[in-house]
Amino acid sequence: MSIEVNWGTATSGPDGEALAERIRSFIHDKFQQVPLPRFIRSVQVHSFDFGTVAPDLEIKDFCEPFADFYEDDEDGDSGSEISEELQHRTHDNPWDRTQSELNETSFRDDRPVTSHHALRDPFDEDFRQHTSSPLRSPIALGDHLNPHFLPRAGTPGIPGGTSTLGYHLMSLGGLSGTQTPLAAVAGGSPFTTNWTDPSPMGQGNKTGIRPSPLHRADADIDSSNPASRPSTASTHPSGSNRSSHPDGHPEHNDDPISSSENPLLQNQPPPRMRERRPEDFQILCHVKYAGDIRLSLTAEILLDYPMPSFVGLPLKLNVTGITFDGVAVIAYIRKRVHFCFLSPEDAEALVGSGSYSGQQETPGPSTGSSGGGNPSPHQKGLSLLQEIRVESEIGRKEDGKQVLKNVGKVERFVLAQVRRIFDEELVFPSFYTFLI
């Protein structure tokens, strides 16, 4: 069953202009994420226009929607609730707020202060044994006399060295080293990374309070704090942190992300599925298009003469039309419309190759001839965009000829990225959902 589309009404007016701008912005953002070759500095997308030629639509089948369309996507809501809760917890305590602004992230604040993490338990016997140095008493004593704006020499035995920022924050708050619980100091002071460990001038033994490799691996999950990330040498030393089975294969317990025993990976629930309803339906539609859709781009080419990246010249590319032949999927589920295209092999499996042979009428650069020995244009690995017509212009023109003619590499790169964006973003299992 064929369908006639009033293309002018569907793509004009304020709604059509807004949709065209959204498509332009979407393609532009995708180009900003593409790694560019050395001879291209940047790619900008300036305009998009639907053109005047409407596509040919032919309904092939009504069927049940794909199971992928029933996945319940609630990550955004739950994520916002969690972030609000973390923010509320972080700003309840002024010490937590100071620590999160100066040193740590809010994720570290919500973790319990136990001996299994980088912040050790201050009431642990092992901790008190090695931190019984009297170095904490001078914090509320003689150093108060140092002027705030005068240079301060390094004082041996004082954690933090010559930095006066955290010291004045603690002294102005009326906190004394002999009166303040060590848990508050370790959890909220700017000396989080140095306070619990004795300084090089101290008397304690560092090996007594250093966490084991397994405990350190748990703390290393917080990758936002550079101080908590060990170097490659400390992460995988030869024969120190990795034990071996009798057969000689090492254990990877110091890598919590890739470990098969990670409870976060084992306890990950399967995606929630919405309930199917009788009114849900899906349409498979054969789409053929050979129109004048337009896309305007600018790629800045770098010239390496007389020196590398000497100057950049703008190359203007105008896509003046495309040739497309594929099967579209439109699914209606509970006030949601899911839209995508099928890959060539999936389309032939669902609608059959006999009803999917109209593409031979519009040959393009990626389309072979109709001879029996040539491969089908819809074999695996070929883009659904069979042909992209483009006009290029670089620099100024003299007597109708371009100053620089060797722009084929830039054209091929830009057009290849246009095909890749289309195939990766609009071909199943990728799809777009519209709320109606």
Curated annotation (Swiss-Prot):
It is a peripheral membrane protein. Keywords: Endoplasmic reticulum, Lipid transport, Lipid-binding, Membrane, Mitochondrion, Mitochondrion outer membrane, Transport. The keyword Mitochondrion applies. The keyword Zinc-finger does not apply. Residues 190-206, 222-243, 256-267 have a biased composition (Polar residues). Pfam families: MMM1. It comes from the Eukaryota. Residues 1-436 form the SMP-LTD domain. Residues 73-98, 184-275, 352-380 are annotated as: Disordered. Residues 73-84 have a biased composition (Acidic residues). One of its GO terms (biological process) is mitochondrial genome maintenance. It is found in: Mitochondrion outer membrane; Endoplasmic reticulum membrane. InterPro entries: Mdm12, MMM1_dom, SMP_LBD. One of its GO terms (molecular function) is lipid binding. One of its GO terms (cellular component) is ERMES complex. Residues 85-98, 244-255 have a biased composition (Basic and acidic residues). Component of the ER-mitochondria encounter structure (ERMES) or MDM complex, composed of mmm1, mdm10, mdm12 and mdm34. A mmm1 homodimer associates with one molecule of mdm12 on each side in a pairwise head-to-tail manner, and the SMP-LTD domains of mmm1 and mdm12 generate a continuous hydrophobic tunnel for phospholipid trafficking. PANTHER family: MITOCHONDRIAL DISTRIBUTION AND MORPHOLOGY PROTEIN 12 (PTHR28204:SF1). Belongs to the MDM12 family. The SMP-LTD domain is a barrel-like domain that can bind various types of glycerophospholipids in its interior and mediate their transfer between two adjacent bilayers. Component of the ERMES/MDM complex, which serves as a molecular tether to connect the endoplasmic reticulum (ER) and mitochondria. Components of this complex are involved in the control of mitochondrial shape and protein biogenesis, and function in nonvesicular lipid trafficking between the ER and mitochondria. Mdm12 is required for the interaction of the ER-resident membrane protein mmm1 and the outer mitochondrial membrane-resident beta-barrel protein mdm10. This is Mitochondrial distribution and morphology protein 12. It comes from Emericella nidulans (strain FGSC A4 / ATCC 38163 / CBS 112.46 / NRRL 194 / M139). The gene is mdm12.
